[in-house]
A protein has these predicted regions:
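Helix-to-beta-strand junctions that scaffold the AdoMet/dcAdoMet cofactor pocket
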Residues: 16, 86-89
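Conserved beta-strand signature within the Rossmann-like core of class I S-adenosyl-L-methionine
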Residues: 90-98, 102
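Conserved SAM-binding loop of SAM-dependent methyltransferases across substrates and taxa
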Residues: 5-18
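Active-site capping/gating segments
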Residues: 102-139
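S-adenosyl-L-methionine
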Residues: 24-64, 68
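A short, conserved alpha-helix within the catalytic core of class I
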Residues: 74-82
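Short beta-strand element of Class I
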Residues: 18-22, 93
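Conserved S-adenosyl-L-methionine
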Residues: 2
Length: 139
């Protein structure tokens, strides 16, 4: 969700060619970026959906077993609630937190939806721009 240039979707498709990758981006120009980049890197078959994820009908899509939230536009908790409604029972949500505020919002969304937060992974090449990779499941 929030595919931007498509880098995470493309890498997922390259690493797991059998994977059905469905990506969402609010900005309409994201579709062209995704198409260009998926061709450039040899990762065909990614379904790119543009528009506001919170208002997107998800019924045409298979239940996801993994969801990566890359962009949330300040609506992270609402996104988590919507994802929980369609997430496969054994599925997970992954989020890269780059600020204390986004970490807190993810934790609140997970707690409010009765999900389980797993231990996170911290990545930092230096003291600038640390990333916390967070994961949650239904149980």
């Amino acid at each position: 969700i929030g595919f931007c240039t498509g880098s995470v979707s493309i890498e997922a498709r390259l690493q797991f060619p059998h994977l059905a990758v469905i990506s969402f981006e609010i900005r309409p120009e994201g579709k062209e970026l995704m198409d260009t980049n998926s061709r450039r890197f040899g990762a065909p078959g990614i379904t790119a959906v543009t528009g506001d994820f919170l208002y997107t009908d998800l019924t045409p899509f298979a239940r996801p077993d993994a969801v990566f939230i890359g962009g949330h536009g300040g609506h992270l908790e609402e996104m988590i609630e919507k994802v929980k409604q369609v997430l496969h029972p054994e599925g997970c949500i992954v989020f890269n937190s780059v600020s204390a505020e986004s970490k807190e919002a993810f934790c609140r969304g997970i707690e409010r939806n009765g999900m389980v937060l797993h231990p996170s992974t911290h990545i930092a090449l230096n003291e600038y721009n640390p990333i916390e990779i967070m994961k949650a499941t239904l149980s």
